[in-house]
Curated annotation (Swiss-Prot):
Primary gene name: gcvT
Coiled-coil region(s): none
Entry protein name: Aminomethyltransferase
Biological role stated in the UniProt entry: The glycine cleavage system catalyzes the degradation of glycine.
Domain of life (superkingdom): Bacteria
Annotated InterPro entries: GCS_T, GCS_T_bac, GCST_C, GCV_T_N, GcvT/YgfZ/DmdA, GcvT/YgfZ_C, TrmE/GcvT_dom1
Organism: Prochlorococcus marinus (strain AS9601)
Keywords of the record: Aminotransferase, Transferase
Length: 370
């Protein structure tokens, strides 16, 4: 089966990017090198093509009323022009996907529109789960992205660069805020969607636009010495920032409480949602495992599946691991037995048959200081 290609595939070829198969897409893992790309985002700005991500449109009169049962988070805690990070759960309280919902407000004829940005590997599952669990006579659900491009401009310089391109200010837009509008000088008939969101721990924007406008933006940013970045740097950046990767750190067997995402569960809202009974029980009785951060001494990298030990006892398993270019040390996430999941608890990590010392930390290893 042929791999899917982004509309910007030709830009990868021009840049001699190293390409890999990611969730059925041929995507760049790196352009100039992971470390250089990582540091570009941390200290200035970097540009990612994330067109492999899925974008689902849900339309209807008050569509939040109909989709609320799919989410443990109160969907009325955000309004038009804002986004909300949340999770979609199965009936066992496991995470089907983590995603962002954007409220585009009323578009026409009293019909409101929500955009869901979902993981590439979960798009088909998400789409079918939504269709199977909702009354489709009340709402419509479509693939919003189609042949559009989704870009992520990340780093402390990202806002200023984007403002230069659109020739207007975005200072009025809050974190997780969004707009969906026409910029006459870019494309007089095209609405461009953008949000102040990202997956790096830095200021950033995610922008959904046509191929023509995307090439315009790509070329503009490259002319401003913004580094094109691949999925390799995206992974190290998100790991430093304490952000989950679906399929590694979370899946249908892990609950929000276990994954450190309990803040997304609004039991006090008293709304019915799929998986509520299981989460009520976990809230009352506690959980057996918990996702934590690990700092590992030495240069060995703890990869997915590596055991975490306390003495002779196996107390957990690593889900994600990497060298941290910012912290200059090996870092990881791991599910640890709750009784051992204590900050500063010293442990050992079994890597390729050898034990390495480590310590349990908070999941976020990096926080921006601006």
């Amino acid at each position: 089966m042929d791999l899917l290609k982004s509309p910007l595939y030709s830009k990868y070829v021009e840049s001699n990017a190293k390409l890999v198969d990611f969730a059925g897409w041929e995507m760049p893992i790196s352009f100039s090198g992971l470390i250089k790309e990582h540091e570009s985002v941390r200290y200035s700005a970097g540009l990612f093509d994330i067109s492999h991500m899925g974008v689902i449109s849900i339309k209807g009169i008050n569509p939040k009323d109909y989709i609320q049962k799919l989410f443990p988070t109160n969907l009325y805690s955000f309004c038009e022009g804002q986004g909300l990070y949340t999770v979609m759960l199965n009936d066992k309280g496991g995470i089907i996907d983590d995603l962002i919902i954007y409220d585009l407000g009323i578009q026409k004829n009293d019909i409101s529109e929500l955009l869901l940005i979902v993981n590439a590997s979960r798009y088909e599952e998400d789409f079918q789960w939504i269709k199977n669990n909702l009354n489709m006579s009340e709402i419509s659900i479509t693939n919003f992205k189609k042949d559009k491009v989704l870009l992520a401009l990340q780093g402390k310089n990202s806002f200023g660069l984007f403002e230069e391109w659109i020739e207007s200010s975005i200072s009025h837009i809050p974190n997780f805020g969004c707009e969906y509008k026409i910029f006459e000088h870019i494309s007089p008939k095209e609405k461009i969607f953008f949000s102040k969101t990202g997956y790096t721990g830095e200021n950033g924007l995610e922008i959904l636009l046509s191929k023509k406008a995307a090439i315009n933006l790509w070329d503009f940013l490259i002319s401003k010495n913004v580094a094109p970045c691949g999925l390799g740097a995206r992974d190290t950046l998100r790991l430093e920032a304490g952000m989950h990767l679906y399929g590694q750190d979370i899946n249908e067997e892990t609950s929000p409480y276990e994954a450190g995402l309990g803040w997304l569960v609004h039991l006090e809202n008293n709304h019915e949602f799929i998986g509520r009974r299981v989460l009520e029980e976990q809230s009352r009785l506690g959980i057996q495992k918990k996702l934590v951060g690990l700092s590992i001494k030495g240069k060995a990298i703890g990869r997915k599946g590596c055991a975490v030990l306390k003495g002779d006892e196996n107390i957990g398993t690593i889900t994600s691991g990497s060298w941290s270019p910012t912290k200059h040390q090996a870092i990881a996430f791991a599910y640890i037995n709750t009784s051992h999941a204590l900050i500063n608890n010293e442990v050992e990590i079994l890597i390729r048959g050898k034990k390495f010392n480590g310590v349990i930390t908070k999941r976020a290893f990096y926080k921006k200081n601006y």
